[in-house]
């Protein structure tokens, strides 16, 4: 029964005996609250009490909860005062009956992720997509020795073809065109709403260990050199990535875009061209990209260029051999066709991404959900614009710039209105090719098909599809991209547990509106997004007094969140998480205003809807995991998010409407009105 009531209790997390025990414990613990609720219902029995408790607002100075019927009653811990710990109040009943395995977690976002993984597993196991079916039929364990020999031949070619640095740069470009991370990927990426051929960093590069590499490179010294060199470049990429989040002055940290334009019309982003004779320049030329059309490049390419120049020919050959093994060893070692397909799909920038994106959009998400969420996004935009206009601290010039950026912001919902038909990779019909060879051929098409189909495009649909190649719409995520000033709401958000057409407006405005759409919109105005203007140029949105006040408020947010503790005593890094926390608070405010714009009726009805909205906001961030999970997930240099309970408690107590809705006049987390942080 509880598994039906609590949608996010994982099937393998709790036994029947535990369910019985926790059920008895839960109802015994909440017996007094149940009696109070029954008394309240009896007292109001002469009324239509299907909605708010119209007489339940506590008197000033009286700290007690409003006990009423709620869409979310199954999650609420009525014994916890909403002014003491709202996250516990809104999700405590669920927390009490949910048991997770050591080091694991469950919750709303975890459920979204589980559904995404379930979809991928299903399509890979069933082979219902034509391209997948062809690979299914071609797979045979008898091809193992043939496949190993093919890989060994590739390593032999690297050994024979690379005798100096210039040949190494050419071989890098050749392997990139074949879909290898050597040590960057070659594809397409949009910068300021124009798609360029691109050198793309790959966060998954460098994970193959020396034992596997040693299967294909028998010489121990050569194997060690290959692994060491590859790990160095992988670490370099990670260091560049971490540097994006490093503080640059008081609370100036934020999401930095990782691509710039080399050559072509740079629009002031970066000086055109590269030093003559530099490795990156030679790779650039070997890829066949002209200076006139330009190339989008990973912002850390200069650091790669420096390391290229310091590397010996032996090290460069080792790097190239490692690149081949790093990608292909898992394909060759797959036990069956499903495992092979999952390895391909899980790879970063995989060639089947657009096929999967389209299939997911057409089979998993009702079209009407996209229309409803699109409408919701425009309501949030309208509410945000009103808040900008009424901002008490922005100057007239600052308001005009902010509203212009918001108005020009693209909001991608789910999938494009039309797909680029010339961007479909095709699986070869050659019956002599093994499944591994078919996959390698698909990777070659990533450059030969995607680059000509997308380069130079400037329209919404092509920009969106370009982003979908590395940010697939079936993943559990949503992003804001500053150099294109666009929000991308993945299609996985258009179904439960995020957008749920069977639930109330309060739920959908909170979970889809606040934690997703409003959150991503506000990223355009956080400590990172505010460094970019309406057209994606790296030019501060605010100046003078506006910028000074904004950074002061960001500093207040950093200090406030730095007071929270998690995972057995770890303090939240308020500076590292400030951009996400600003986005959370902005989304919470904007979606609330959007909801209130839809709610008519009496003041009591509006207060009831407000309470339901804030309760749903907590459900959107609902999560349970032990200290091991919390430490592993949040105590890392690249995770810029605070733990979910902090994202709730750190923000709701900043909002005046929250206090009004629940009649809160005190409590452990109460913040005096004059001390509440008001940004967006």
Spans of features found by a protein language model:
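Bacterial N-terminal signal peptides that target proteins for export
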Residues: 5, 9, 16-32
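Active-site-surrounding "flap" and adjacent substrate/cofactor-binding loops of secreted or lumenal enzymes
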Residues: 81-84, 89-145
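Short, well-ordered loop/turn elements at secondary-structure boundaries
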Residues: 81-83, 191-195, 472-475, 482-484
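Short secondary-structure subsegments characteristic of cysteine-rich extracellular domains
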Residues: 101-127, 221, 239, 244-252, ...
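Noncatalytic, helix-rich "gating/capping" subdomain that lines the substrate-entry/channel surface
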Residues: 119-380, 416
């Amino acid at each position: 029964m509880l598994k039906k009531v609590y949608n996010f209790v994982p099937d393998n997390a709790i036994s029947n005996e535990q369910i019985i025990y926790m059920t008895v414990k839960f109802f015994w613990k909440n017996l007094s609250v149940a009696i109070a609720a029954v008394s309240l219902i009896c007292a109001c029995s002469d009324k239509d009490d299907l909605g708010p408790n119209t007489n339940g607002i506590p008197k000033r100075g009286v700290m007690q909860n409003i006990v009423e019927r709620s869409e979310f009653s199954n999650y609420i811990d009525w014994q916890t005062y909403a002014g003491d710990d709202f996250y516990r109040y809104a999700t405590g009943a669920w927390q009490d009956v949910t048991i997770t395995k050591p080091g694991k977690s469950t919750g709303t976002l975890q459920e979204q992720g589980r559904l995404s993984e379930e979809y991928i597993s299903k399509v890979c196991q069933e082979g219902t997509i034509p391209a997948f079916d062809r690979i299914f039929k071609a797979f045979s364990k008898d091809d193992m020795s043939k496949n190993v020999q093919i890989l060994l031949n590739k390593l032999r070619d690297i050994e024979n073809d690379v005798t100096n640095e210039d040949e190494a740069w050419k071989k890098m470009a050749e392997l990139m065109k074949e879909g290898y991370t050597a040590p960057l990927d070659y594809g397409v990426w949009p910068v300021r709403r124009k798609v360029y051929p691109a050198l793309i960093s790959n966060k998954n590069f460098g994970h193959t260990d020396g034992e596997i590499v040693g299967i294909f490179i028998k010489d121990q010294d050569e194997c060690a050199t290959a692994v060491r060199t590859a790990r160095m470049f992988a670490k370099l990429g990670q260091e560049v990535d971490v540097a994006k989040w490093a503080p640059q002055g008081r609370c100036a940290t934020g999401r930095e875009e990782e691509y710039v334009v080399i050559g072509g019309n740079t629009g002031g982003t970066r000086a055109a061209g590269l030093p003559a004779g530099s490795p990156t320049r030679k790779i650039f030329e070997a890829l066949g990209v002209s200076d006139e059309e330009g190339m989008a490049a990973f912002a850390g390419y200069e650091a790669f260029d420096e390391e290229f120049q310091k590397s010996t020919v032996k090290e460069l050959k080792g790097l190239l051999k490692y690149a081949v093994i790093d990608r292909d060893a898992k394909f060759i070692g797959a036990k069956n066709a499903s495992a092979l397909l999952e390895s391909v799909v899980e790879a970063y920038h995989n060639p089947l991404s657009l096929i999967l994106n389209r299939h997911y959009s057409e089979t998993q998400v009702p079209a009407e959900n996209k229309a409803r969420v699109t409408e919701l996004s425009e309501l949030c935009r309208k509410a945000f614009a009103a808040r900008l206009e009424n901002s008490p601290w922005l100057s007239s010039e600052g308001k005009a710039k902010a509203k212009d950026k918001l108005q020009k912001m693209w909001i991608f919902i789910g999938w494009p209105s039309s797909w680029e038909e010339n961007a479909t990779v095709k699986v070869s019909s050659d019956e002599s090719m093994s499944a591994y060879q078919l996959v390698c051929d698909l990777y070659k098409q990533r450059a030969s098909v995607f680059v000509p189909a997308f380069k130079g495009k400037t329209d919404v649909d092509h920009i969106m599809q370009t982003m979908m190649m590395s940010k697939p719409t079936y993943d559990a995520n949503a992003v804001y991209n500053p150099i294109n000033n666009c929000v991308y709401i993945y299609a996985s958000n258009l179904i439960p547990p995020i957008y749920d057409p069977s639930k109330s407006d309060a739920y959908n405005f909170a979970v889809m509106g606040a934690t997703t759409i409003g959150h991503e919109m506000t990223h355009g105005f956080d400590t990172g997004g505010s460094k970019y203007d309406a057209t994606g140029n790296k030019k501060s949105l605010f100046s003078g007094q506006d910028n000074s006040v904004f950074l002061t408020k960001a500093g207040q947010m950093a200090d406030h969140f730095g007071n929270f503790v998690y995972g057995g005593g770890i303090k939240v890094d308020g500076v590292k998480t400030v951009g996400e926390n600003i986005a959370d608070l902005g989304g919470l405010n904007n979606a609330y205003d959007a909801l209130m714009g839809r709610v008519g009726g009496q003041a009591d009805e509006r207060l009831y809807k407000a309470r339901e909205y804030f309760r749903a906001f907590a459900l959107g961030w609902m999560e349970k995991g032990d200290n091991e999970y919390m430490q592993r997930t949040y105590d890392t240099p690249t995770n810029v998010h605070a733990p979910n309970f902090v994202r709730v408690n750190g923000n709701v107590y900043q909002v005046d409407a929250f206090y009004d809705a629940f009649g809160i006049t005190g409590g452990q987390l109460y913040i005096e009105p004059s001390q509440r942080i008001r940004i967006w």
